[in-house]
Amino acid sequence: MDATTAPHRIPPEMPQYGEANHIFEMMQNMLEQLLIHQPTDPIPFMIDHLQLDNDYVPKILVLGPPASGKTTVAMWLCKHLRSNLLSVENLIARQFSSLAAGARQHYQKFKTLPSGLLVRLVQARLREEDCVTRGWILDGIPETREQALLLQTLGIAPRHVIVLSAPDTVLIERNLGKRVDPLTGEVYHTTFDWPPQPEIQNRLLVPAGISEGETARKLLEFHRNIVRIAPSYPKILRVIPADQPCVDVFCQALTYVQTIHRSNAPFTPRVLLLGPMGSGKSLQAALLAQKYGLVNVCCGQLLKEAVADKSKYGKVILSFFEKEIAVPDSIIMKVLGRRLDQQDCVERGWVLHGFPRDLDQAHMLNSLGYKPNRVFFLNVPFDSILERLTLRRTDPVTGERYHLMYKPPPTVEIQARLLQNPKDTEEQVKLKMDLFCRTSAELEQFYQPVLPLNGDQDPYTVFEHLESGIINPLPNKVP
């Protein structure tokens, strides 16, 4: 761009396209790969990297002491994510590899591998096509800080590191009941995870090195190493308690590896708040606008402002207001579109509430390019909605608003003159709730992924959940 023509007005479609297609992250990933591999000809290298389309494949380390269940969790993650599991055992068991054959002989003799040899095995395996295209999960690797540093030196960097943790007494007791299926490699337990099939039961073997003394020695070695490995992965490491059912451990691990770490990409929030009347959308929108500078766009308020300004559309809207009938969607979109196209909405972002109310309006909003990047659904029980709305009152003298339960009038005199808005009668509230329930499921399906929130709690607690949903990236979808 020509610097002399500043300030520049960037079309809103440009940042939306960049955000939707992860342009910033793509450029960042390419730069990382250039710095790691340092190719002599970077252009063909970048083209090949883009064609691989593997920036978001799983790259996971699963670490933990003996009997913590790390192998089981790693295998389940591998099946669920359709990735590749790498462990010391399957690396040295690979056929048609002279490196693996040498490592196998060394392991059979010394029951361990030198750090350099293990890292070379990992590096060779990660270069193969299936690991490049579908990612990888390392089970129990690295074992020492030296191995972690060697992996980092080669540019082998995980996106998620899981460390399982449990008391030593629990692990020693658990290890004594450990059994292994020699055909599948699945790990079972005589007490906690015994297979129901008799054929599997009959072929289970007792693994070597599970005695109490041997387990205690391995635990001591693990504790000595993990405190030196952990600082190598400061922002991507998650400790998960392993002293709970294996399914719960797996669920926590899966939830973590589905998260996306915060990006440095520029982000302009475009927030849509959905929910029944009385769910607190207006309050939450005001709080977001106050703290983050977003433009608070209330559809109903925009229509009233258009009428007050006596604009071209305002005169048309006034005629519908006077007849007490709904304003056509096309006119609403004209007014709403003019507001969302203004520069403050483009630069600072917006929080929209009160529109859309049905699937047709959502399609119309989407077709005109007004696509939210965060959609929240405030869920509030019907009884709470009735309590919030039917007990609202207004003082006609001062204009002060009261609630008979949460903010009662201070004097009997004021209470005697309070009036109820006709829209807040129980019949009207039930009618509007019925209309909302008819369309809410379609809206929720249209705007996937929707972030559901419990709106029946303290407003500032709801606001904290809103903040978290806006600041943190949306989780990955895993089939």
From Swiss-Prot:
It catalyses: AMP + ATP = 2 ADP; a 2'-deoxyribonucleoside 5'-diphosphate + ATP = a 2'-deoxyribonucleoside 5'-triphosphate + ADP; a ribonucleoside 5'-diphosphate + ATP = a ribonucleoside 5'-triphosphate + ADP. Residues 391-424 are annotated as: LID 2. The lineage of its organism: Eukaryota, Metazoa, Chordata, Craniata, Vertebrata. Keywords: ATP-binding, Cell projection, Cytoplasm, Cytoskeleton, Kinase, Nucleotide-binding, Transferase. GO terms for cellular component: 9+2 motile cilium; axoneme; cytoplasm; cytosol. Residues 298-327 are annotated as: NMP 2. This is Adenylate kinase 8. Its main location: cytoplasm. The gene is AK8. Nucleoside monophosphate (NMP) kinase that catalyzes the reversible transfer of the terminal phosphate group between nucleoside triphosphates and monophosphates. Has highest activity toward AMP, and weaker activity toward dAMP, CMP and dCMP. Also displays broad nucleoside diphosphate kinase activity. HAMAP family: Adenylate_kinase_Adk. It comes from the Eukaryota.
